[in-house]
Structures are given as C-alpha cells and as structure tokens.
Amino acid sequence: MAKGQSLQDPFLNALRRERVPVSIYLVNGIKLQGQVESFDQFVILLKNTVSQMVYKHAISTVVPSRPVSHHSNNPSGSTNNYHGSNPSAPQQPQQDSDDAE
C-alpha cells in the first residue's frame, strides 16, 4: 500500500462499511451526495438514485454527514483520528535546505 493511502483507505472504508451519507465536493465546485459504494486507487463509486464513478483527482473534499471512526494500523497505538501529527508536540521551525549552511 502506498504511504499516501494509509489514511485515505481506512477513512473511505469506514464510510462504505457504515453506509454514512457523504457530500463530495469536486475541484470545480460541484457538490455530489450519496454513499460510498466502493473505491479503488483512482475512483470512488458513489451511490444515490444512480451510481456515479468519481475520479479521485477531481475531488477536493469528502464530508461525512456524521463523525466516523477510521483507525488505521497505527504502530504508535494512538487512538485519535488525526494521524501523522501530534498536536501536543512543540512546533519546530522548518528550515529549507537552501538556507542551511
């Protein structure tokens, strides 16, 4: 599994499993609504009165109608839904490699 998919897949799978109604906003501003029927690396199959195949590269935002629990296999044992950052950790300033001497 690609590193970038480690949050996306569990989130979409929880939406599919729990049949959570979602609003999907496309990059052109169009809002689609329905339930995630299926998904793969490139598309989401969204079901409402009809099924629509929505290409992920066209999606801006996926908004569930209610909170979902989407825990991936996180080796740190963290139980929060925000993987990849620790909000309680002190922030270190980032330094570009061009600035480092």
Swiss-Prot record:
Top-rank taxon, per record: Bacteria
GO molecular function: RNA binding
Keywords, comma-separated and alphabetical: RNA-binding, Stress response
Gene Ontology CC, one term: cytosol
Sequence ranges of Polar residues compositional bias: 70-86
Residues annotated as domain Sm: 9-68
One example of a Gene Ontology biological process annotation: regulation of DNA-templated transcription
Chain residue ranges for the region called Disordered: 63-101
SUPFAM superfamilies given in the database record: Sm-like ribonucleoproteins (SSF50182)
Keyword RNA-binding applies: yes
Family: Belongs to the Hfq family.
Assembly, per entry: Homohexamer.
Function field: RNA chaperone that binds small regulatory RNA (sRNAs) and mRNAs to facilitate mRNA translational regulation in response to envelope stress, environmental stress and changes in metabolite concentrations. Also binds with high specificity to tRNAs. Positively regulates the expression of the yst gene for heat-stable enterotoxin (Y-ST).
Name of the protein this chain belongs to: RNA-binding protein Hfq
Organism: Yersinia enterocolitica
